[in-house]
Amino acid sequence: MRTLLAVALLVAGLQAGQATQSTKGSSTTKITALIYAPEIEPSLKFWVDQLGFTKVVEVPEGNKLGFVILVKDGAELMIQSTAGVKKDISAMVEYARPAACLYIEVGDFDDLVKRLGTAPVVVPIRTTFYGMKEIGVREPGGNIVLFAAKVQQSATH
C-alpha cells in the first residue's frame, strides 16, 4: 500500500511539473504564504536570527510591526500581526489567528535541526515512507512548520 501511495505521489509530482501553463483564466504567477501572529517580533527571532531569512519589507503598526515580508533562497514568507489585520482588513480579524501549517523542503536537514534551537517540537524527527526526513515545530507566532529533506540529502540521524 505504501509503495502504491509513493508511486501515486511521484506521478502526481511529475504531472504537476508538466502542467506549467493553464488554458483557462489568467495565469498563476506566484504563491506566497501569509501567516498570522499575535506579535511579529518574536517570530522574527525565529525566522531571521535562527533560520537566516532576510526582512525585505516592514510596515509598522503603532510601536510594533504590523506586517513583514521575509525572503531566503527564492522563498518568500509574509507575516501579519492580529492588530495589522484588524486595521487593514477588519472582516478578516476572526480568521487572523495562528492556524497555518507550512511544509518547507531544505537542503541540509542536520544544519536546520541545529538552527531550530529550543523551538517546541510537535513532530519528532522521522523518516517517511515517501523518502523524506522531517521535523515539525511550532514557531513563536503559533503556526506549525514542517521541515523536510530528501533522505539521500540528509545525514543519518
Model regions and ranges:
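Hydrophobic h-region of N-terminal signal peptides that target proteins for export
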Residues: 8-17
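Vicinal oxygen chelate
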Residues: 18-34, 54-105, 111-138, 149-157
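Short glycine-/small-residue motifs
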Residues: 144-147
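Mature N-terminal segment immediately following signal peptide/propeptide cleavage
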Residues: 32-45
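Conserved active-site tyrosine of GNAT-family acetyltransferases
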Residues: 43, 47-48, 116, 139-142
